[in-house]
Amino acid sequence: MAKRVKLDARLDSAAADRLRAQLSGSADGDLTLDATSVEMLGGLCLELILSARSLWSARAKAFAVDAPSAAMIDDLARYGLTPEALAGDAA
């Protein structure tokens, strides 16, 4: 069963340590990030999410970002990304 982690509303540099800890604590299985409440996505947290996606894929574990908020989608667009860029490759 996949672990589900609800992302903080503000994913700025102040939230990076907490996000890193949440990701590290979930590294042993499939992971879904609940992005419904994200109001701001900063570069450092985006890097952590993209890195986690790659790590989960390398481990052949499922990784998903579920229901990104409109604000998160807007922030992704500013980085030249779409929500699909956060999708994991493993099943």
Tell where the protein language model's regions lie, with residue ranges:
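STAS-like cytosolic regulatory interaction modules
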Residues: 1-44, 48-91
